[in-house]
Every structure is written in C-alpha cells, then in structure tokens.
Design a protein with these regions (language model features):
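Flexible, acidic/Gly-rich N-terminal and inter-domain linker regions that tether
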Residues: 1-130
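Conserved Radical SAM active-site core
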Residues: 98, 111-138, 148-195
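Cys/His-enriched microdomains
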Residues: 141-145
Length: 195
C-alpha cells in the first residue's frame, strides 16, 4: 500500500508471430508513424501479413463479414499482432475489429445510423451540444483503428458494400464556427474532443 502503481507490460516481441513483421525490430515496431504507415486495411493486406497463417476459410469468412458491415477495416500492426490467430473465431480483439460473416446476426428492426442522435443535437458541423455545460467536438474523422461496432461508422472509414458515406473530412478552417460557438456559450465547461 501507498507505493506507486506498477504494470507488468508485455516486453516480448509478440509481433514476430505474424510473418510480415517477423524481422521488425522493437524500435521500429514501437514507432507510431511506422504503425500508421503499415496498418492493415484490406483483405490483401491481411493475406500479406498472415501468409501461411491465413487459411482460405478464414479469408472467406472475413470477406463475408466485410460485405455486411458499415465499417472498413484499419488495424495497426500492434493490434493485428495481438489477435490470437490460432483461435481467431473466439478472439475478443478480432471480434472488435474484424467481423466474420459466420458470426453476423440480423440488425434490430429499429437500428439507426446515428444511434446516439449526435446529429440531432448538432450546433455546428463538428460540434454536438446536448447538455447545458457539455459538448462533443469531432475535429477529425481518422482513427488509428476502426472498430466494427463504431457508433460513428456512418461518417468514419469511407464507404463500404452496405454503407455509402459522404466525405465528412473535417478541416481545420471549418473549425472556426465551432470555436465561435464555444466562445458564445460560456456555460460550456466540458468539451470532449473525439474522432
């Protein structure tokens, strides 16, 4: 009691189990720019990363999942390497980022694109003001990874087979109206910045 909290981080080179990154050193692998540049964003990217680990059944199941989901895929090598590919059907990380066609269930009849009704309370193109002292500022639409169940899949990650998306692409010059709105609402005390 009373001492600093410590965490036992995994110091192993776990990514070496993925054929594409077998020869990547820890300094390179730990570089966030390298992670972004080498993100897996397609079926060919999955095949390239996994090589012999990618069975045709796995690839077909992921392809079937991508035909049903409104979100594209984007996984950094770090996240991709954390998936236990020997038991991919049940892996919780895979479930979060890579949908399988075999695991889809029908949508609820009242499913909505904007399930959190953020657009209803939009004060500016990039600011949702729902509560008197709180607002949500969405300055960008790029995430380092794309979660398959993202509540903003209607605007993030580009169009898919089942969802056509307009180019949201927030730009800094478009933020002026948001900053002006915030300045004109001194009751706002808490601004959540998200993507």
């Amino acid at each position: 009691g009373g001492g600093p909290l410590t965490y036992d981080f995994d110091r192993s080179e776990f990514w070496r189990s993925i054929p594409l990154w077998r020869n990547v050193d820890s300094k390179t692998f730990g570089d966030f720019r390298w992670q972004q540049r080498n993100s897996v964003t397609s079926i060919p990217g999955i095949k390239e990363a996994l090589c012999e680990l990618a069975s045709s059944a796995l690839i077909s199941d992921i392809e079937a999942g991508l035909l049903k989901t409104p979100m594209n895929i984007r996984l950094t090598p770090y996240i991709f390497s954390r998936i236990h590919w020997e038991n991919f059907e049940n892996d919780p990380i895979r479930r979060q980022f890579l949908p399988l066609g075999s695991q889809f269930v029908p949508d609820h009849p009242q499913v909505m694109d904007d399930s959190l009704a953020e657009d209803v309370d939009k004060a500016t193109p990039h600011l949702t003001h729902r509560y008197p002292d709180k607002a949500l500022f969405l300055p960008i639409t790029l995430c380092p990874v794309y979660c398959s169940f993202c509540t903003r899949s209607r605007v993030v990650g580009g169009s898919t087979a089942v969802k056509s998306k307009s180019a949201y692409g927030a730009k800094s010059k478009e933020w002026d109206s948001t900053f002006e709105y915030i300045r004109n609402h001194p009751d706002l005390e808490d601004i959540v910045i998200s993507g």
